Amino acid sequence: QEAGYNVIYKRPDNTEFAPDQNEMATLQGGYRFSEMTDQGTMSDYGLCDYYDNVYNLNQMDRGNYGYNEFQMKCFTSAEGFITSNGGGGVLCSYFEKPVLFYVPSGKELRPGYLTKQNSYIKKLSNSDINVVIDKGQTNDYSKLLNEMRKVFKWK
């Protein structure tokens, strides 16, 4: 836990939407999202239980709210967002809070696509957009962690 933040983790589980070509390849290939820890290999959802103050949105008590309404209430209360590029990142940008995009692939790699003043994302929102590019898809998250410290004022 850094700086007293709580983290709400949100990732669809391939059952909420019609799968795209990447999800189809993942499902057909039997691939799972996982990470090595001192406790062995665990899924990205399992990591939510592994770390303190990390909560899986899919497991939170929604009360009488539907999934989307609950998600919007959580997003409204957030201090900011860390997201991958794509539609989920666009949604995060609507709340006028700092957004940190991690971009390993896609059209967002183009210079200025997310950051220039007249970019698509800036036209949709008035959020402070920050971007970490991982063009070689090296999954070296040190740049992301450094940018998180700057954007969210961690020490």
Regions found by a protein language model. Give the residues of each.
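Histidine-anchored nucleotide/phosphate-binding helix
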Residues: 1-2
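Donor-binding and catalytic core of enzymes assembling or modifying cell-surface/extracellular glycoconjugates
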Residues: 5-109
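Nucleotide-sugar donor-binding patch of glycosyltransferase catalytic domains
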Residues: 89-155
